[in-house]
């Protein structure tokens, strides 16, 4: 996740992918499991490096289907984030500088990110969505020869990312951190919905340029729910005779008005 100083804090659900190369320059992808350091900027991960292979680089977050061909890494920016708990999952890369000592890996961001805090969330809300002018999810490639590798969406493209969470009357505020590819965006729209037919707010940002490791911080938004009667609903109510006076008064009603003052 991300703290108030916009530094990445590790979580106990995090995992890394360690890519190792053999004598034939074929790569393996080994999962490194979280061990300690939740809530800190540094954490410890454990795993086993394949025998006879050399550690080359590490990727966050771990994805089982990540692969390397030549100098190109292929991974995914998911269009759907289920059971979202506020994690950023922003993709990062760390080059191994000493294959014999993996005790300190320094990660670099490979994308940008949008941060948005939503307050006064309705109890029925279950979905946060980002809709962009560019492709923001799908299969991505990374040029590993670059000094600062970045993700580029290349196939199975989507212009939407949806983060779903469990509806709750107790949670009134949520932070959303959604990774976005670098680039120039004519529009980026955020929505909070109930997952089907109700949109609680829509916020659109125009003409944004996002570079590697940029965080687009949107001022906090409050959800406001307004109940209104539509003309059709009013007509239906008036058509029901029970909503109208049933009979006129039998006696005339006289109202006296006294006016005083200088005229």
Regions from the language model: what does each represent?
Residues 1-225:
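Sec-type signal peptide cleavage vicinity
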Residues 229-238, 246-263:
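N-terminal extracellular ligand-recognition/capping segment immediately after the signal peptide
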Residues 241:
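Short active-site loop/helix that positions an aromatic residue
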């Amino acid at each position: 996740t991300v703290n108030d100083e916009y530094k990445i804090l590790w979580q106990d659900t995090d995992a890394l992918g360690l890519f190792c190369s053999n004598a034939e320059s074929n790569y393996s992808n080994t999962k490194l499991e979280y061990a300690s350091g939740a809530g800190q900027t540094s954490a410890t991960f454990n795993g086993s490096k394949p025998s006879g292979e050399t550690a080359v680089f590490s990727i966050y977050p771990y994805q089982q289907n990540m692969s390397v061909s030549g100098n190109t890494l292929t991974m995914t920016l998911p269009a759907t984030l289920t059971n979202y708990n506020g994690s950023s999952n922003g993709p990062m890369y760390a080059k191994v500088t000493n294959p014999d000592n993996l005790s300190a890996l320094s990660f670099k961001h490979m994308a940008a990110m949008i941060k948005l805090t939503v307050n006064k969330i309705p109890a029925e809300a279950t979905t946060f969505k980002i809709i962009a002018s560019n492709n923001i999810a799908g299969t991505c490639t990374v040029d590993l020869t670059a000094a600062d590798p970045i993700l580029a969406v290349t196939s199975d493209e989507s212009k939407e990312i949806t983060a779903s969470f469990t509806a709750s009357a107790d949670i009134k505020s949520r932070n959303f951190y959604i990774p976005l590819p670098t680039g120039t965006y004519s529009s980026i729209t955020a929505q909070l919905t109930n997952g089907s037919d109700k949109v609680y707010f829509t916020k659109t940002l125009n003409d944004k340029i996002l570079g590697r490791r940029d965080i687009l911080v949107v001022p906090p938004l409050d959800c406001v729910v307004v109940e209104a009667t539509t003309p059709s609903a009013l007509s239906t109510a008036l058509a029901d005779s029970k909503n109208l006076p049933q009979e006129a008064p039998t006696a005339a009603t006289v109202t006296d008005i006294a006016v005083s003052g200088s005229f």
